[in-house]
Amino acid sequence: MKNKTKHIAYKSLLILFMAFHFSCSDDLSERNDQFPQLNPANTDEFAGTWKTILLASPDEFPLDPPIAVTTPAYTREINEIKSYQNNITQEQKDIIAYWSVGGVLRWNEIMRTLVARHNRPPYQNEDGSYPAPSPANPFANPEFPFSNPPYAARAYAYVSAAQYDALIATWHYKKVYNRPAPFMVDNTLQVLIPKSTLPSYPSEDAVLAGVTVELLKLLFPTEIAFIQQKADEEKLYRIISGANVRSDIDAGISLGRKIASKFISRAATDGAGTAIGNQALWAQLEKQCAATGEMPWKSLDIPTRPPMLPLFGNVKSFLMTPAMVIASRPVPPPSTHSEQFANELAEVKAYSKNASKKNMQMVTFWADGVGTYTPPGHWNAIAAEIFVTQNYSEIRWARNMALLNLSLMDAAISCWDAKYFYFNPRPCQMDPSIKTLTGIPNFPAYVSGHSTFSGAAATVLSHIIPSKKDAFQAMAIEASNSRMLGAIHYRSDCEKGLLLGNVVGNFAVLRAKIDGAE
């Protein structure tokens, strides 16, 4: 009965996800018109006391007091809203409909789309070498970034963490200044979205726009015009809808930018910029593995491609110390000379030769390869569809997405540490007769990245919404198994990857238990 209930819960959750899910594409058009307007059951009015991630305190960056609502300047700001509303266009109505579902959700959608657009490995030069994208010259060929899974996981984490800290500061200053919402000052004012009882200064949407734009400009520098366009829409929506006056917006943008600067400074020194390594390092990794008597991994791309970010395991985590990463490292994989390895290789070959329609659907659904928002993005999409049904406040949205994405970044760090520590070959390297059913990633096999990401995500989401734990765990297992069914991973890769993800996810859960939000 328990297994049947778990199966039903999983299927229900998957159907819900598929009903809302739109795939990413190069036209930056991932949108979801079926989401309702944000109308939280609880505004979390005391969230200004929640534990920040990087800020030393919610008031680390000062915010000037607002102008009084009795001043002529404030009256002019009220009149600006009325002027917009008296001449509202269909385009402006569409902007309100789009952004009123919530800023955290919409920026997450936008980021997933940007990740998908830039998830393109560089094409080789005429001499067979591969150029590397450079943040110093992002418009060159190849464009920066190549948003592969580790890069994407880090990007989601930085943006989500910065948004969360920014909204904690916002809630703090709302409480400090207690400026009433415009409709409470002028009862003739229309409000075109659900009314909020929260103070209006500073605007939470403006803070989100301010902090997110600065992070996305760093992470996706060729997309600045589009990113700024979306931020301008978000600011305009709050004014036209009657939710905020101009000074609420201006203060929010200023505060968001200040907070972004602290995260940008951290990003500059977290080690991600040197994670690609160099030719000497790549050769050393192969030599070290061979010295143990094991078969070292090699790139199966033609021409041979440099390994993907072999030093990403050294990137600075938000929740784990380097010692914790090493302590969490999984046990060694089966020796390439062992009977267990031979059995697991044979199992992969059998799946390759006897692919069922059901297995192929599973492989395809969880592939998340080139041109997609990556496995971390897939779990962001799953979380978003479920969070919409929970009627969270904007700040609780930010908190939950931050917990998820911090764990996914740590999953990338821990998984890449294991991959390049063990340098284990792919099944089709050991047996070239194996035909893979999905793309072959350009990095070692052990442990599976999909499995680690999925284990971490399911652990965090199960804590956030315990009633859906069985469904989240079932999805993680299916995502993990899909890599073995696709003939690119051994069973040990998948099973140990899930376990590593669970360990990593629990570090985020431990933080959740003491962050003041529960």
Language model feature labels by segment:
Residues 1-2, 25:
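N-terminal hydrophobic targeting signals that begin at the initiator methionine
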Residues 2-13:
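Bacterial N-terminal signal peptides that target proteins for export
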Residues 20-23:
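C-terminal motif of bacterial Sec signal peptides marking the signal peptidase cleavage site
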Residues 25-518:
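Acidic/polar surface patches and capping/hinge elements
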